[in-house]
UniProtKB/Swiss-Prot annotation:
Component of the TFIID basal transcription factor complex, composed of TATA-box-binding protein TBP, and a number of TBP-associated factors (TAFs), including TAF1, TAF2, TAF3, TAF4, TAF5, TAF6, TAF7, TAF8, TAF9, TAF10, TAF11, TAF12 and TAF13. Component of the TATA-binding protein-free TAF complex (TFTC), the PCAF histone acetylase complex and the STAGA transcription coactivator-HAT complex. The PCAF complex consists at least of TADA2L/ADA2, TADA3L/ADA3, SUPT3H, TAF5L TAF6L, TAF9, TAF10, TAF12 and TRRAP. A motif ([KR]-[STA]-K motif) lies at residues 187-189. It comes from Mus musculus (Mouse). Residues 27-39, 77-86 have a biased composition (Low complexity). The [KR]-[STA]-K motif is specifically recognized by the SETD7 methyltransferase. This is Transcription initiation factor TFIID subunit 10. The keyword Phosphoprotein applies. InterPro entries: TAF10. The modification Phosphoserine is found at residue 44. Monomethylated at Lys-189 by SETD7, leading to increased affinity for RNA polymerase II. Lysine deamination at Lys-189 to form allysine is mediated by LOXL2. Allysine formation by LOXL2 results in release of TAF10 from promoters, leading to inhibition of TFIID-dependent transcription. The lineage of its organism: Eukaryota, Metazoa, Chordata, Craniata, Vertebrata. The keyword Acetylation applies.
């Protein structure tokens, strides 16, 4: 194939030489991004397409990136990297998992308040062993003024339970002391126990109350 007028026009001569030489071989694109794409990546803000975050997400780490070249059917379930794992339903604060309701500020009590309401209603018709006047007197001495009689009776019940537990523990110490002394079992059923300070002291020590034996003068 001949080209005419190639000496007059250099551009026409170049085009004619290219057509004579045939189609150019395919050249693989360079690995680096074009200048325009790199400029767009620098100009894009974080979190948008082409920004630094998108570049990190595309690159990937761990087993997901190692199997990126495999076919989709051979990959199987890809493990999620620690950095890209989505948080659970609750919020993560300093590595501590919080329930969704607690994260939203909607904290509800676990125990229902219905039994407590019923118990307070029963206190209106209940007369404790300790009179209300005695409990109210000691509350006033401690600087607590209770106008609701149910509160006074509730404190009276707590005091009764505390004294009852101490008395039962002291009785157990007394029985153990009697068993260790070698008394017969037949007589122990009808035996009457008298609690002394020796029985009361170990029982009180379990509750953090240290009682010293009073001095005996002759």
């Amino acid at each position: 194939m001949s080209c005419s007028g190639s000496g007059a026009d250099p551009e026409a001569a170049t085009a004619c030489a290219a057509s004579v030489a045939g189609p150019a071989p395919l050249v693989s694109a360079p690995a680096a991004l074009p200048t325009s794409t790199a400029a767009e990546s620098k100009a894009s803000p974080a979190g948008t397409a082409g920004g630094p975050v998108a570049g990190v997400a595309t690159a990937g780490t761990g087993p997901v990136a190692a199997r990126a070249g495999e076919p989709a059917e051979r990959r199987g379930p890809a493990s999620v990297a620690a950095g890209g794992a989505a948080p659970p339903e609750g919020a993560m604060s300093n590595g501590v998992y919080a329930l969704p309701s607690a994260a939203n500020g909607e904290v509800k009590p676990v125990v229902s308040s219905t039994p407590l309401v019923d118990f307070l209603m029963q206190l209106e018709d209940y007369t404790p062993t300790i009179p209300d006047a005695v409990t109210g007197y000691y509350l006033n001495r401690a600087g607590f003024e209770a106008s609701d009689p149910r509160i006074i009776r509730l404190i009276s019940l707590a005091a009764q339970k505390f004294i009852s537990d101490i008395a039962n523990d002291a009785l157990q110490h007394c029985k153990m002391k009697g068993t260790a002394s070698g008394s017969s079992r037949s007589k122990s059923k009808d035996r009457k126990y008298t609690l002394t300070m020796e029985d009361l002291t170990p029982a009180l020590s379990e509750y953090g109350i240290n009682v010293k034996k009073p001095h005996y003068f002759t």
